[in-house]
Amino acid sequence: MNDALLVSQPGIFSWNRIDDGSALLVAHLPDDLGKHVADFGCGWGYLSLVMLLGSPGIARLDLIDAEYRALEAARANVTDKRATFHWLDLASEPAPATYDTVVCNPPFHTGRAAAPALGQAVIEAAARALKPGGRLYLVANRGLPYEPVLKAHFASFETLADNNKFRVSRAIR
């Protein structure tokens, strides 16, 4: 993947680079994500690009973001015919389908203000959108209060990676 050819712009999360959390998440994604997969809070599409390249069994990948400019950047970057794009706010609107796997680097800011409840709402949306036995792969800053939400909405979860800044988790519905 050539970063110089990707479309983004100031104001979109990690607009000019691949963020460290997403890079850590990608290093822990399996090759088989299932047939129906979603990228919740897709941003400019980095995680989706990696999933489509690394998991050939994906039949459909839904890219979902509440930020219109981010979704349009993802649309420009992710041209694979398996990708579909949805402009919606997962904190208040249901996902468009059910999934085998949801991958997420959830937002936790509104503007410049910290809003961990936003990330918690996205995790709850993932739980509602996953098929029984479906998997959530999640990266988040270590200090965010997401474990209680994972415990409340998933049958199990485990930490796949943990460094001084980020934690990658897999949760099973």
Q: Which residues make up each language-model segment?
A:
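Conserved SAM/SAH cofactor-binding pocket of Class I
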Residues: 19-104
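Short glycine-dipeptide loop
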Residues: 57, 130-135
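Short beta->alpha hinge that forms the Motif I/post-I loop of the SAM-binding pocket
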Residues: 65-69, 118, 141-142
